[in-house]
Amino acid sequence: MHFEILVEDQSGKKALDILIPRIIGDNHTFNVHSYKGVGRIPKNLGAKGDASKRILLDRLPKLLRGYGATFVNYPQEYPAAVILVCDLDNKCLKIFRQELFNILNTCDPKPETRFCIAIEEGEAWFLGDIPAIKAAYPKAKDAVLNAYTNDSICGTWECLADAVYNGGSPALSAKG
């Protein structure tokens, strides 16, 4: 089987490039595509959108239509699927899932698709393994890392940035 994995940022891509081969094994293939943020689902699902904007949800209707048209030509013995990985952020899960399925239901043909929604930000995965953070960032701030409560809803990207980035989340936010 082949997997096309869409993720909202570069850090998610780096993590999935390492994790996915361990999950799917050698008999399957995959590509991870990162975007410059999650964005918003467009009101007009048929709109073309600006391809230069690499914003995940803004591009999703066109991406899913393209994957549907491509995957229909894959051999039956080697199917393909799209996996969308993104954060819930401040959205209502029930409404957000319905919006994603509304996009998928406009596709003809419809690609095999799974929506993987992190209730808290994906950075919570990283904060769940403090020794790995310390191995990658030996100068990471212990006080910040030790104050994090695993699986808490607390602004995890800010916590991770405060631990590993010079100037913390305010400095990173200032960069855009």
Give the residues covered by each predicted segment.
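C-terminal accessory helical subdomains adjacent to catalytic cores in phosphodiester-
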Residues: H2, K13-G176
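Conserved SAM-binding loop
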Residues: I5
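Helix N-cap/beta->alpha junction signal
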Residues: E8-D9
